[in-house]
């Protein structure tokens, strides 16, 4: 009987942890929107995971900015040739 209550407690703790993660991501997404970062939930989630793995947030920000510039340049060049 004790093992089933232990499993129930573990499931409840896992559910509470998942809810906390979701709430944290919702708050981060709202901050991201306020700061007008243009990041969607999936991209923001990837950035958070990269930072958790030790990637420097400032370096990550620089890479994102450079990728956006390169994308805009490619779009502009594509529009010139069409």
From Swiss-Prot:
Superkingdom: Eukaryota
Locations listed in the record: Cytoplasm, Cytoskeleton, Microtubule organizing center, Centrosome; Cytoplasm, Cytoskeleton, Spindle
Keyword Transcription: no
One GO term of the biological process aspect: gamma-tubulin complex localization
InterPro entries: MZT1 (IPR022214)
Cystine crosslinks: none
Chief location category: cytoplasm
Cellular component aspect of the GO annotation: centrosome; cytosol; gamma-tubulin ring complex; interphase microtubule organizing center; spindle
One Pfam family it belongs to: MOZART1
Alphabetized UniProt keyword annotations: Acetylation, Cytoplasm, Cytoskeleton
Keyword Protein biosynthesis applies: no
Modified residues (N-acetylalanine): 2
Subunit record text: Associates with the gamma-tubulin ring complex (gTuRC) consisting of TUBGCP2, TUBGCP3, TUBGCP4, TUBGCP5 and TUBGCP6 and gamma-tubulin TUBG1 or TUBG2; within the complex, interacts with TUBGCP3 and TUBGCP6 to form a luminal bridge with actin that stabilizes the initial structure during complex assembly. Interacts with TUBG1.
Family of this protein: Belongs to the MOZART1 family.
Function of the molecule: Required for the recruitment and the assembly of the gamma-tubulin ring complex (gTuRC) at the centrosome. The gTuRC regulates the minus-end nucleation of alpha-beta tubulin heterodimers that grow into microtubule protafilaments, a critical step in centrosome duplication and spindle formation.
Name used for this protein in its record: Mitotic-spindle organizing protein 1
Protein's organism: Homo sapiens
């Amino acid at each position: 009987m004790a093992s089933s209550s232990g499993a129930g407690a573990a499931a409840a703790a896992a559910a509470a942890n998942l809810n906390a993660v979701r709430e944290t991501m919702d708050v981060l997404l709202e901050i991201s929107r306020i700061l007008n970062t243009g990041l969607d939930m999936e991209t923001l989630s990837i950035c958070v995971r990269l930072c958790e793995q030790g990637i420097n947030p400032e370096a990550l920000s620089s890479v994102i900015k450079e990728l956006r510039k390169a994308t805009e340049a490619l779009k502009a060049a594509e529009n010139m040739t069409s």
